[in-house]
Amino acid sequence: MERYEPLKLEEKWQKIWEKEKPYKAVEKEGVPKMYIAEMFPYPSGAGLHVGHVRNFTIVDVLTRFYEQQRLNVMRPFGYDTFGLPAENYAIKTGRSPKDVTAENVTNFRKQAKRLGYAIDWDREINTSSPEYYKWTQWCFLQLYKKGLAYQKESYQWWCPVDQTVLANEQVENGCCWRCGHEVEKKKMKQWFFKITEYADELLDGIDALDWPDKIKTMQKNWIGKSVGAEIDFPIVGETNFVSIRDNGSERRSAARDDGPARGGEQNQFYNNRRITVFTTRPDTIYGATFLVLAPEYPGLDYIVSDDAREAVEKYRAEALLKSEIERQENKEKTGVFTGAFAVNPATKEKIPIWVADYVLAGYGTGAIMAVPAMDERDREFAEKFDLPVVETELCEFGQFGTPKTTYRMRDWLISRQRYWGCPIPIAYDAEGNAHPIPEDQLPVLLPEIDDYQPDKSGRSALAKAEDWLKVKIPVKDAKTGKTKMIECTRETDTLDGYACSSWYLWRYVSPHDAEHAWAPEAINYWAPTDIYVGADHAVAHLLYVRFWCKFFADQGYLPFREPIKKLIYHGYINAPDGKKMSKSKGNVIDPLDVINDGYGADTLRTYEMFIGPVELDAAWDPRSVGGVYRFLNRCYNLLCSNVANSCSGSRRSLPSTDVVCQLSSRKNELVRSSLDSSGSPPRGSRANSRAAALRNPPNQELAHIRHRTVKKVTEDIYKCQFNTAVSALMEYVNELYKTGADKEDLVVLAKLLKPFAPHLASEMLERLGVDDEWPKWEEKYLVSDTVEVVVQVNGKLRAKLMVDTADLDDEQKIVDLALADKKIKKYTVDGVKKTIFVKKAKLLNIVV
C-alpha cells in the first residue's frame, strides 16, 4: 500500500497554493462576507512557537470552514514590528532595528507558509513600514485636532533598564513587562490620548459584545466606574480656628463660621485653597475625622508645612518606589502628617491632613476623606496614628458636595522615549509651543542613526539626529491671523506600539491604498471584523481598538461603532510539565522541529486543535502528537484502499495489522488497542459486537453514521469546540475501518478534515475527483436503524444488545435475542421467572 509521506504531500500543495493564490479576497456583490483575523504577532528572532500555531490554526480552521461553505472569506496577515525588543537588540549588537525586523518578518512569513495557512498574502502589513505608519501619524493628528491627544506633566512609571515610560497596564507586579526589572516613578511631560472621554460608551457597550465573559468583566473592572460626590475641604491654618466650649468640652471650630469677632481675620488661603475629595459615601461626611492624600497628589508641595516638609518628601520618595499592587496589600499602614489642616464642611471642625500610600493618585482626585468608623483601612490608619474615630449617623450630602462620576481608567499614555517606534507628528517653536506636522508632510520618517542608546536625561536617541530635528512648517500667527513658515524642532518621543495596533484591522481592507488609511468602499464591504482570535491584551489593545473605533465613527470615517463582532480568546500551550514555555527555561517547542521530524504540518495543526478546549491552557504531549499522526495515516490508508478497489466497487476493510484509535470517554486523549488476528477488536469487547453488527451494515445505518458525523463536526466548529470536532472525525474513521469505506464516505471525510489537515484533505479530494464544498446533513438520517438495549439479570448489568429500531415494539423478539446471548445463558440455566421490558429506557430485566 502507498505510504503516507506528509512532507512530500505538503510541499506539493503549498507550491500549488503559492502559484494559484486560491485565498485572494476580493469584494463580491451579493455574496456574504466573512472577515477573520488573529491578533498579529511580534516577529521575534526566535520565530514561531507552538503558541503562535494554536492562534493561527484556529483562524485557519474557521477560514477554511467558511470558505467551504462558499462565503467570501478574507484572512489577511501582518506583523507588529515596532517596539523595545528590536531596539534593545540594536543597542546590544549595533545592527539596525529596520534590518533585523526585515529578517524576522521574512522568517515568520516562511514559517507561516510551511503550516499551510489560507492567507491572502496580498493583504500583508508591517507596522514599521513608512506606508503603514504614515497613516498611524494621520490617526494621531485626527485625535489631536479634536483635543483628544494632549500633553501633561505627571508621575509616570519609568523603567531604568529600558529607559522609557510605561503605561499602567505595562507594569506587572511592580516590574517592567518587557525586561522584568523593577520600575520607579518619574515626573515627566508626556503625550496622552483622552480615552476617558469615551468611558461611558466603552462601558455601556460591553454587555452586547459576543466576547468571552471574563474579558468583558476585565474591561468593566478596568474602566471602573464609581458614582458618588466631590466635596471641598478648605485648607486653613491655626489662626482660622477658635476654641468653643460646649457643655464643658472644648472643640476647635472654623473662625469663618463663628464670625471675625471670635476668630479674627480669616487666613488668606481660606477661600482659594481647598482639597477636593471624591467619595462614593458622601452620606458619611459627619464621620470624616482626617484627610489622606496620595504621595503623588499634585498640590502636596503647597500644602505641607515647613516643619513637616523633610519627612513628607522622604515618605513620598519611598512610596513612589512601590507598585500600586504593593500599596494595596493588607500590610501595616504607613503615613506622615503634613502639618496642615482642613475644615470638615459638615461639622465645621478642624481635621488633620495626612499622606499615605494606601491612597492612589489614579483614583478619584487622589485625596480621600477618612471615615474610620465606616471604613476598615481608615480605621487601621486611625488606630496606628491615634486619630479620632467618630460614630455617626448617615446624612443627606447635598449641601456639602456635588454629584460626581469617576473612573478607575486613566487617559492612555502613548509617548515613549525610544527610537524604534512611530514618530509623533508634532514640532515645537522657539517658545516651546506644539504644532502639528501638516498632513502633506507625512510620513515623518525615522532617520538612519548609528547610536540607538537613549540619553540619561530620558530623551530618545532621536534627540541626537540633529539634521532630522529641524523642520519648517506653516504656523498661523495668533495676532495677525497670517500663516508663515517657521523653523521648529521635532518631537523626539515615539508612539507606543498599541497606537499602531489600534487600527490595523481597518488597514487590512485596503493595505496598498496611498490616499486613505482605509478605503471607504472596502471598509463598507469587509468591516467590522467578524471573528478575532487571540490570547492577550484584554484591557489594553482590546480596549484601545474599541476607543479608536468610536472616535473615527464620530468623525465619519467608520460606519460602525464596535470593531469586532466575535472574539475567541484561547489558552496557552505550556511545556509538557505544565510550566509556561520560555527561552530562558529552554523548554520552547519549535513547530518546525515537529514538522521536520516527519509528522508534517497537518499533524501539528490537528494536534493543537485536539489538545483540549480552546479556551483553556494545555500541556504539550509528544505522545499525543504521534497519535494524531497515526489518525491521519489511517485516513490516507482509507483513501489508498478505496482507490485500489474502486474498479470492483466493493467495500474492503484494511489489513488487520493496522491500529484502531479510540477516543476515551473519560479523557480527551488517544489510546491504542490492536486488532486481533481476525481483523476484529478483542473478543468480549463492546467494540467486537458493534463491529460484528456492522460488518455488512444496511445503507440506512451507514447514512446515519455519515450524517451524524457531518452534523457533529459542523456544530462543533461553529461553537469553536475544535477538540470534539476532531474526536468525531476519529470516531468516524473507526467506523469506516469496521465497515469498509466507499467513495461517498471518503468524500465526506476529506471535506470535514480539510479545515484541520488541508494538505491531506486536498490530496484526497483531488484523487476522488470532487470539490471541497462543505457537506450537509439531513435530519431523516440522524435516527439510527439500530439501538442499544441494556440487559439485566436480577437488576445487574450482564449484556448489551444491538437490535433493529423496528424490533423495539416486539418485546418477545428482544427477550428471545437476550436469552440466546452466551453471556445471558449462564445466568438462566435454572429457568426464568419473568421478564420486564421498558421500551422508553431500552432496558430488559430478566428475573431468575
Q: Where in the sequence are the language-model features?
A:
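A cross-taxon signal for low-complexity, glycine/charged-rich
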Residues: 238-239, 243-270, 644-645, 649-691, ...
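Structured secondary-structure scaffolds
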Residues: 1-78, 131-135, 190-237, 272-303, ...
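Catalytic cores of secreted or luminal carbohydrate-active enzymes
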Residues: 750-770
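Short hydrophobic alpha-helical runs that function as membrane-insertion/retention elements
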Residues: 388-393
